[in-house]
Structures are given as C-alpha cells and as structure tokens.
C-alpha cells in the first residue's frame, strides 16, 4: 500500500482537512476504522500540526491509518472527559496573548500555560495586546516579573501596529500557536499579520465581561511569516493531570534555589530549611509563588479525587 504523509490543518467530528506534504494539496481525511489507534485513551486523537499516514481512495479523499510520533503537544485538562485534551502538536513557539486592560490580564492563566510550555519544551512568548487603550500599573508589574525570568514579553496594538514586526520575527520559519482567553484579540492580531486569514472578529461581550468565542476549532495555516495555529478563546486552562511532584521543575526561578533546600524532595511549601521560601521577595516573586501554591493545591486535590 502506497502511504502518503499529510499534515492536519483542522478537523471536527472525525473529519479532517489535511495537507499532502509533497503536492501541498488539501484533502478530506477520515479514519479507516471507527477510531484511530494511538495506544492510549485520548480526547483529541488528531489536532493541527499532527503528521499522519494515509492513502487516497477517491477524489481528494484519504483514509487516515496512522499518526506519526509527536515532538510535543500543547494540552490542557478537559474536566468533562477527565482527560488531557491536546490542542495543537509539533510547535516551536506559543504566543500567550493577553489584553492590557479588558479582559483583565490574569497571571494564573499565564503561569499554567508556562508550565505546559516548560514541560513540553515549547518556547513561550507573552503578548500584551491592546496597549493603545493604556496599560495599568498592575500589568506593567506582571510584565517586569516575566521579563526578569527570561521570558520574552511583547506589547502590541492592531491600531498602532506596535509590536507586529516583533511577532513576525518570532513566526519566521517556525510553527507558532496563538492562545489566550476570549476577547484578548488573537484573531485581530492574526488578521493583521496575514491579511488573507479570514478570521472573524467579534466585539467583547460587556454583559459577561468576557469575549465571544470567534475561533471555534484550532486551525493552522501557512502565512508569509511562518505557520500559524489559531486556537479557540479559552476560559480556563487546567493542568490537573500533571503529577503534583513535578510542578516545581516547571517554575524556572526555583532551579537556582532548590539545590540549596535541606531535602531533595522539598515541594517548597512548609518544609524546614527551604531555600525557595527564604528567597521570597529576593529572587523569587511573591506573585509567582502564590500562583505555584494555588496550582499545586489543584494538582493535589485532583490526585486525591482520582483515587
């Protein structure tokens, strides 16, 4: 059987739009059987960025038989299914898009995404969008905290074009996913970066103080700058299936202090002679530490619930 390689562009209800890698032609792909055998229970067996093997059986139609191994995944916890839900795969960068003012920038959301990025070896870039409407002192403080940790922080506006050139530099010759809560302006940024991207943009719903979901499914497309993956606006980004003992490794500022803790198994909560705790406010941000404790509590509660 003559297998061909395809890249998943997007899909819904187990019907996928896939790109044949050699011809660059788009096909409609479906599973040969009822499900795709991946060796584990998954909420999303195929997502944008996946490479699959299949064969053509009709006019622009393909039976998908296998999924190639993934370099990495951007995932979150799906509470309803009680599983990890993969959003995109095989990406180089993730742009975590936030609003400078409305909807309110939330460091807890950013920190959860950063944990997954660190776990999966994805380069995270924090974007503060809509700066033409002003930036609060609180947002500026968040920005400095992440900059001091070595994370790239870009300030952008689709009205003044500030930061757009820098985003295009990030995108160049790479695969980059945009993620953010509803209403932060992801689709507006993508439309400005690539005018051919037919992304709909809705006004923020003031009634609920959140944005309307304008991108319903994750979708990737090739732009002049690089490969872009847009994702739906996300209200919550849970990471409950991450083992709580591992969380400490993904707060990068702990690394230089953890080796000085009395106990190797130190979780930096209430243990005696904890170098991380003693460094709060002097090398360790109190805001980031509060975020760590909150996430750690969630992971512990999930483990107890799952027993």
UniProtKB/Swiss-Prot annotation:
GO terms for cellular component: cytoplasm. The keyword rRNA-binding applies. GO terms for molecular function: GTP binding; GTPase activity; metal ion binding; rRNA binding. One of its GO terms (biological process) is ribosomal small subunit biogenesis. It is an enzyme of class 3 (hydrolase). It is found in: Cytoplasm. Residues 80-237 form the CP-type G domain. Its EC number is 3.6.1.-. GTP binds at residues 129-132, 180-188. Binds 1 zinc ion per subunit. It comes from the Bacteria. Zn(2+) binds at residues 261, 266, 268, 274. The keyword RNA-binding applies. SUPFAM superfamilies: P-loop containing nucleoside triphosphate hydrolases. Its cofactor is Zn(2+). Keywords: Cytoplasm, GTP-binding, Hydrolase, Metal-binding, Nucleotide-binding, Ribosome biogenesis, RNA-binding, rRNA-binding, Zinc. InterPro entries: G_CP_dom, P-loop_NTPase, Ribosome_biogen_GTPase_RsgA, RsgA_GTPase_dom. NCBIfam families: ribosome small subunit-dependent GTPase A. Belongs to the TRAFAC class YlqF/YawG GTPase family. RsgA subfamily. Monomer. Associates with 30S ribosomal subunit, binds 16S rRNA. HAMAP family: GTPase_RsgA. One of several proteins that assist in the late maturation steps of the functional core of the 30S ribosomal subunit. Helps release RbfA from mature subunits. May play a role in the assembly of ribosomal proteins into the subunit. Circularly permuted GTPase that catalyzes slow GTP hydrolysis, GTPase activity is stimulated by the 30S ribosomal subunit. This is Small ribosomal subunit biogenesis GTPase RsgA.
């Amino acid at each position: 059987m003559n297998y061909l390689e395809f890249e998943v562009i997007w899909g819904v209800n187990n019907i996928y739009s896939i790109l044949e890698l050699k011809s660059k032609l788009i096909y409609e792909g479906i599973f040969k059987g009822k499900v795709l055998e991946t060796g584990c229970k998954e909420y999303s067996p195929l997502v944008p960025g996946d490479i699959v093997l299949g064969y053509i059986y009709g006019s622009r139609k393909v039976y998908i038989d296998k999924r190639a191994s993934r370099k990495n995944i951007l995932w979150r916890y799906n509470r309803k299914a009680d599983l990890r839900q993969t959003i995109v795969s095989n990406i180089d960068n993730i742009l975590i898009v936030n609003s400078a003012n409305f909807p309110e920038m939330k460091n807890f959301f950013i920190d959860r995404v950063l944990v997954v990025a660190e776990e999966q070896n994805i380069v995270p870039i924090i974007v503060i969008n809509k700066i033409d409407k002003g930036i609060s002192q609180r947002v500026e403080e968040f920005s400095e905290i992440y900059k001091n940790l070595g994370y790239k922080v870009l300030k952008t506006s689709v009205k003044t074009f500030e930061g757009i050139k820098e985003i295009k530099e990030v995108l160049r010759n790479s695969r980059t996913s945009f993620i953010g809560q509803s209403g932060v302006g992801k689709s507006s940024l993508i439309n400005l970066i690539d005018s051919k991207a037919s992304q709909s943009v809705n006004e923020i719903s003031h009634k609920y103080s959140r944005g309307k979901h304008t991108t319903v499914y994750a979708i990737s497309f090739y732009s002049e700058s690089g490969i872009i993956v847009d994702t739906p606006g996300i209200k919550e980004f849970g990471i409950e299936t991450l083992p709580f003992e591992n969380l400490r490794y993904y707060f990068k500022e702990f690394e230089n202090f953890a080796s000085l803790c009395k106990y190797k198994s130190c979780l930096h909560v209430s243990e005696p002679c904890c170098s991380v705790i003693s460094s709060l406010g002097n090398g360790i941000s109190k805001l980031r530490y509060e975020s760590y404790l909150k996430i750690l509590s969630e992971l512990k509660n999930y483990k107890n619930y799952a027993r």
